[in-house]
Amino acid sequence: MENEINYWGVPDSPIDWCEENYIISKYICEFYNTFSSFIITAFGVYGIFLMMSASSRDQALFQHVKIMKELKIRQKVLFSYLSLAIVGVGSAFYHATLLYKNQLFDEFPMMLTASMFVYCILTIDPVDEKNDTATYKLMRRFLPYILSLYVIVVAITITIIRDSPIILQSSFGLLIFSNVFLSYMYTSRCLKTPVMESNPKKFLYLCIASMGIAYISWLTERKLCNNGYVIPGVQLHAVWHALTGLAGFYYIQFFITSCLEKHGYKTKLNWNYGIASVRGFIKSY
């Protein structure tokens, strides 16, 4: 009967979230979780917009993009924001259907985005051909291939083994732990100034705060869900979507700001509708 009523048929994903299925529309399994996923995409698209500006009307942004091109980090940033945007699209497909094939469309971009963040944090420091060891230079050369292989192996594994969410959770968790650890090591080693005087630290702390609240929302819903809600009228998984999108946006801004200051550029925060982004300008020496 459910196959006849619901457009996508019976959900076959091993995970069902708190929001009740097909309550608002027979075409969308989890209505609020579906549309909140596009907030993640919106943050990715906004980040791409900031990197694509070629208008001289906004001189600060125009110069910022020019500096990014000179430092040869613009392509990395564009790819990071593109992968973040795809996470939102994949998540929307998944929550709209709760089909396993679309769950993979959600999980593959998550792995790709997290691995891209690891790549970014490991490549803030430029390779020093004179002083860096041969082992380090070899690692930097093969780093993209190592991370790509990791993502491919995990993708193949979760495609074959359907009923074991722990595989994705542990694999993705390892990338997130790596991001946290590497970011901590970088800030401890290179960012000695207090947080109020350090723009990279500000972005990193904004990222941590967003991700922390997002995780609390996710965990609370998983543990305390009752009849489709924890708090009546509030979908905490939708809050998770919005804040993880924001955290991803801020992490990339942390990377950009760190690169700019590493190369001697000054930075400032630009606030637009409550969202901060960086602008790089003149050399500080």
From Swiss-Prot:
Question: What membrane topology was assigned to this protein in its record?
Answer: Multi-pass membrane protein
Gene Ontology CC terms, in alphabetical order = endoplasmic reticulum membrane
Transmembrane segments annotated in the record for this chain: 34-54, 77-97, 104-124, 141-161, 166-186, 200-220, 236-256
Pfam families of this UniProt entry?
A: Ceramidase (PF05875)
**GO terms under biological process:** ceramide metabolic process
Q: Which GO terms describe its molecular function?
A: N-acylsphingosine amidohydrolase activity
Question: What is this protein's record name?
Answer: Putative alkaline ceramidase dcd3B
What phylogenetic lineage does the species belong to? Eukaryota, Amoebozoa, Evosea, Eumycetozoa, Dictyostelia
Q: Give the encoding gene's name.
A: dcd3B
